[in-house]
């Protein structure tokens, strides 16, 4: 399609989405859940078609030299497919936030007022790799009464179109508008430019992908954006940490999965326990993955450089390492004087995503969660828990590190807003 065709195509997509959003806003919980379960059934029967489409994408990705992190996100295997099916059930089982009325109060004037939760309207989502996001985002949009326009990456085109076919069939089975969920049928980047500027038809944009994509969307969008740039997550091992917990959590936070935004990228260790505990943590992390590379500040080098178990896994950290989301088996390690320096380092170099303290000291734990300026702050738990499913939100449409509207994992409630409702009996303002 040429530029004029793309503009016309996107304008039509936007108009249909706006019309569908009005019908969805009026849909009851039963109708929305029926749509989710109809999509579940169609998807389950189309497993081989979807996995075959994904294999085409994976083969193309390997031919095009996609990096390991992107290939990991792109892949759909049996476990991830089953997770997609379960995700639909989980979202259907969640309480419906739409229509919830809170904070009802009487005013001296005689009016009775409160707040009602309502859909945002039309959500535009732009994302890379992860074809399961297509289904997760669609399910959350439907349950929260929003229409959604989905633009996946070209590397996942075949997978996304196969999933879109199932969504469309499921919607038709229950008589819901086929425009409630639209997966764009073009990989032309001009479509993204149109989507993020269609203020008449789109109420919010949610980008998920690399830092370059997020920065471009944030810079060029005229529609409000819910976003996070990257996931430079920290774990701080305090002087009062339980050694067993420190080792276990550090290994999980770094090695559980590399291509995710809640993976630990920097390990901070209090100097009071570094000599004793850091070698044990480092050895455990390298044992979990022999490909691991540890990038050390001067103090960490002094402790670890003579460790024969870690030979071939160590190098000196540079200033850039403290600001880097690796998405790879690379971990930066820094020795600090204590919690003051840890909080300062995290707030200076972190991405305000998820940060962790390992400590048995209640006072320090409470100070950490108050003063660290991140969307999720954890005590004695892996940063990998920063996830919509783990937080009980069902699927998540993304994670926001912004402070306005939604922060942290964005589930159903993050796709809604509140309007004031007022009941009266003929009251007039004096």
From Swiss-Prot:
From which domain of life does this come? Bacteria
Which Pfam families does the record match to this protein? Answer: Aldedh
Pathway, per record: Amino-acid biosynthesis; L-proline biosynthesis; L-glutamate 5-semialdehyde from L-glutamate: step 2/2
- GO MF assignments: glutamate-5-semialdehyde dehydrogenase activity; NADP binding
| Any single biological process term in GO | L-proline biosynthetic process
Q: Which GO terms describe its cellular component?
A: cytoplasm
Catalysed reactions listed for this entry: L-glutamate 5-semialdehyde + phosphate + NADP(+) = L-glutamyl 5-phosphate + NADPH + H(+)
Q: List, alphabetically, the Gene3D superfamilies matched.
A: Aldehyde Dehydrogenase, Chain A, domain 1 (3.40.605.10), Aldehyde Dehydrogenase, Chain A, domain 2 (3.40.309.10)
What InterPro entries would the database entry show?
Ald_DH/histidinol_DH, Ald_DH_C, Ald_DH_N, Aldehyde_DH_dom, Glu-5-SA_DH, GPR_dom
CDD domains noted in UniProt: ALDH_F18-19_ProA-GPR
Keywords from the UniProt entry = Amino-acid biosynthesis, Cytoplasm, NADP, Oxidoreductase, Proline biosynthesis
Q: What does this protein do?
A: Catalyzes the NADPH-dependent reduction of L-glutamate 5-phosphate into L-glutamate 5-semialdehyde and phosphate. The product spontaneously undergoes cyclization to form 1-pyrroline-5-carboxylate.
Family, similarity comment = Belongs to the gamma-glutamyl phosphate reductase family.
Q: Which NCBIfam families does the entry link to?
A: PRK00197.1, proA
Q: What is this protein called?
A: Gamma-glutamyl phosphate reductase
Organism expressing this protein natively: Psychrobacter arcticus (strain DSM 17307 / VKM B-2377 / 273-4)
